[in-house]
Structure formats: structure tokens, C-alpha cells
Curated annotation (Swiss-Prot):
Organism of derivation: Bradyrhizobium sp. (strain ORS 278)
Free-text function comment from the UniProt entry: Involved in transcription antitermination. Required for transcription of ribosomal RNA (rRNA) genes. Binds specifically to the boxA antiterminator sequence of the ribosomal RNA (rrn) operons.
Biological process (GO), any one: DNA-templated transcription termination
Sections of the chain in a coiled coil: none
Designated gene of the protein: nusB
Molecular function terms, GO-annotated: RNA binding
Sequence similarity: Belongs to the NusB family.
UniProtKB keywords: RNA-binding, Transcription, Transcription antitermination, Transcription regulation
InterPro entries given in the database record: NusB-like_sf, NusB_fam, NusB_RsmB_TIM44
The keyword Transcription regulation appears for this protein: yes
Cross-referenced Pfam families: NusB
Protein name, per record: Transcription antitermination protein NusB
GO cellular component, one term: cytosol
Length: 168
């Protein structure tokens, strides 16, 4: 697997469309889940930190795109609440010999958030969920890992929303 890249970066865009706010919320959720995994930070502290210091604010000279705060909270809280259900599903979807705990922390965060959204957020098209989390992964890992993210999330999309995904 690739070396972990530094995990900071502005959430920027020229427009404040709902899709951009949701994309920013997804990226912030992955960052928050990563922080919780690596630093052992608690959910309340992480939610408060991101909502007061990161989302829509200027940090170290970079303007972060406003994120849909309720969507951000739903993803982070949902992953934490459902993690004991999400992790075994991801372990099954991953290749044999690569359990979830063996992959990079950033990929765990991406996969957990994507799995949660695929299972629980039926208001978001499955293909959008897969595409968004593959794009997020691409910002931090090499192409091989983004391919793995795509394969795992597509497998889960077919499992949770087969009718929506259509034939293989």
C-alpha cells in the first residue's frame, strides 16, 4: 500500500451549490473519522472542532468551502453508531488477507463513510456515493488504492441497492 500522505487540504470551490456543500461534508467527514481513528479523539470533540474551526472557515490562509453541517454530522455520527455493523461488511468485501484493520487509516475512513452512506442515505444515488468517495480517496492515495475503494463500494452498492445499480 502507498505511504500515508499528509492529511490536510482545503475544501475549495467557486460555487456554493448543494452538491459542493455535500462533497465538502463528505471530505470533512472522512477527515473527522480519520482523526478519530488515529488520535483516538471522541465524536463530540471532533464534531465541535470541525464545525467551529474548519467548515466554511479560513484555515492557514486557505478558504474552506462551506459544508452541509447536518450531512457532515449524519455521516460521522452514523459511522460511529453503526461501525460494529459496517466493519464486518467491509471485511467481507475486501480481498482475503486484507482485513479492514490492515489497510491505511485514511482508506478505512473513506470505506466506512461510503458504506454508511450507501446503506443509510437512500436519498443519494449509489453511483454518486461511489464516485464521490473514489474522488476523496484519490486525493490521498495512489491509483491502486482508489481502484480498491471503487471495487469495494460498487460491491456494497450492488448489495444494498442492486435495483438501482442495474446489471453488472
Amino acid at each position: 500500500m502507498a505511504e500515508n500522505k499528509p492529511f490536510r487540504g482545503p475544501i475549495r470551490a467557486n460555487t456554493d451549490r448543494k452538491a459542493n456543500r455535500r462533497g465538502a461534508a463528505r471530505l470533512a467527514a472522512v477527515q473527522a473519522l480519520y482523526q478519530m481513528d488515529i488520535a483516538g479523539a471522541g465524536i463530540n470533540d471532533v464534531l465541535a472542532e470541525f464545525e467551529s474551526h474548519w467548515l466554511g472557515n479560513e484555515v492557514e490562509g486557505e478558504q474552506y468551502l462551506p459544508a452541509e453541517a447536518a450531512f457532515f454530522r449524519d455521516i460521522v455520527s452514523g459511522v460511529v453508531r453503526d461501525q460494529t455493523k459496517i466493519d464486518p461488511v467491509l471485511d467481507t468485501a475486501l480481498e482475503r488477507g486484507w482485513p479492514l484493520q490492515r489497510i491505511e487509516a485514511i482508506l478505512r475512513a473513506v470505506l466506512r463513510a461510503g458504506a454508511y452512506e450507501l446503506e443509510r442515505r437512500k436519498d443519494v444515488p449509489a453511483k454518486v456515493v461511489v464516485s464521490e468517495y473514489v474522488d476523496i480517496a484519490h486525493a490521498f492515495v495512489e491509483r491502486d488504492e482508489t481502484g480498491m475503494v471503487n471495487a469495494v463500494l460498487e460491491q456494497l452498492a450492488r448489495q444494498y441497492r442492486g435495483d438501482e445499480m442495474g446489471p453488472k
